[in-house]
């Protein structure tokens, strides 16, 4: 039996998703929780490898219980896990899937959202969930950022928006949708695609902020993409503003 479980977590107190001995990770907590629920060691596989400090509102995992372990109806799994879960991690829903299903390789789309709060003073209630950018942007920042965002749509080689040192050979990805939203002091960049390179969304967010601040022009984006050079794009935004928002299969 294999379960597909949708989870949510705050990334501030985690060293990323992937298990690391001696460090608190999402996968490490899931291993502990699932072992308690099913009475034995489970195989837990994630849809992505989020970095330290990155959160998720809709992260998908598969759980494969041990042979001979406790059998739990899928709809009851979130409540069965609740007593063992920490406060910054929750099971949202669960269902059974075929043994051939893979939570990472069967993904059709992922939506990430990056949140930037532009203010000289931070908001303690948003600590660990936004990039606190201590500069007030120009009044024309939002239309400039939206104009730049259009250039990311479609299928492109996004090598310029990948962290240096990554060993990925195929750097072509497709962006299906992109929005730049503003509410009060909070700017949110929403990006939906078929997959993302290492730090890609954070570099896109940093680049859009540079456009909003006047350090880059909206029409610079096609040239940056074509260059395939990381140094041409903007800064890598910090991890705390990033959330995996939605995964579809």
What residue ranges belong to the model's regions?
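Structured-RNA-binding interfaces characteristic of tRNA pseudouridine synthases
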Residues: 1-249
């Amino acid at each position: 039996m294999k379960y597909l479980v949708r989870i949510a977590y705050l990334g501030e107190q985690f060293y990323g998703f992937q298990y690391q001995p001696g460090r608190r990770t999402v996968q490490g907590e899931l291993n502990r929780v699932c072992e308690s629920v099913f009475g034995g060691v489970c195989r837990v596989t994630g849809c992505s490898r989020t970095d330290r400090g990155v959160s998720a509102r809709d992260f998908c995992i598969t759980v494969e219980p041990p042979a001979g372990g406790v059998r739990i109806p899928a709809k009851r799994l979130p409540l069965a896990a609740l007593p063992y879960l920490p406060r910054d991690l929750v099971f949202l829903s669960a269902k059974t899937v075929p043994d051939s299903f893979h939570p990472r390789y069967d993904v059709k789309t992922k939506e990430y959202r990056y949140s930037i709060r532009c203010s000289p003073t931070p908001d303690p209630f948003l600590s660990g969930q936004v990039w606190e950018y201590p500069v007030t942007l120009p009044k024309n920042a939002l239309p400039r950022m939206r104009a730049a965002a259009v250039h990311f749509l479609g299928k492109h080689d996004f090598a310029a928006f990948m962290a240096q040192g990554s060993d990925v050979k195929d750097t072509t990805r497709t962006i299906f949708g992109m929005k730049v939203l503003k509410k009060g002091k909070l700017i949110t960049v929403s990006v939906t695609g078929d997959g993302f390179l290492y730090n890609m969304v954070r570099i896109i967010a940093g680049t859009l902020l540079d456009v909003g601040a006047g350090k880059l022009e909206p029409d610079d984006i096609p040239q940056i993409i074509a260059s395939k050079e990381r140094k041409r794009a903007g800064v890598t935004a910090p991890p705390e503003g990033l959330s995996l928002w939605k995964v579809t299969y």
